[in-house]
A protein has these predicted regions:
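Anionic-ligand binding patches
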Residues: 2-6, 12-35, 39-148
């Protein structure tokens, strides 16, 4: 069965989640028709947007154009109120090295150490984007989970 949708990511967890969501929403879609970027040799997309929305839409659009498949992409991170939305799009590399969750968390907590707990509100923000290969359809949605 040929791929129909490509996830603009090589994250196995995201692929599993996307397959579950889409095959439930679209019963005619088989799980193996949803593939990750590496499976179809999609190039890495530079995330140089200044918002979650811009990065997600860029990844979806470029991946769809490169593969000829419908593409889904996301960009997400933590937005701390007292830090005016930082670390934001830099969440995964806040401490310098991309993907070092412990270092990112340690640095963020150190930066907030003199802030009273009552003023440590934050949100997890996720932008999910969809694009068709011809560029005619592009859409992005934002989800936000607020905590304190």
């Amino acid at each position: 069965m040929d791929p129909v949708i490509v996830l603009a990511s090589n994250n196995a967890g995201k692929l599993t989640e996307l397959r579950a969501i889409l095959t439930e929403a679209i019963p005619s879609l088989a799980p193996e028709q949803i593939v990750d970027a590496a499976t179809v040799n999609a190039p890495d997309v530079v995330e140089d947007g200044v918002t979650f929305e811009a990065n997600a839409l860029k990844k979806a659009t470029q991946t769809a154009q490169a593969t000829g498949l419908i593409a889904v992409a996301d960009d997400s991170g933590l937005a701390v109120d007292v830090m005016h939305g930082a670390p934001g799009i830099f969440s995964a590399r806040w401490a310098g090295k991309h993907g070092d969750d412990q270092a990112n968390m340690d640095l963020l907590l150190a930066q907030l150490s003199d802030i009273d707990a009552a003023h440590r509100g934050a949100s997890f923000v996720c932008a999910a984007a969809f694009a068709t290969p011809d560029g005619a359809t592009r859409h992005v949605e934002i989800g936000k989970l607020t905590g304190d």
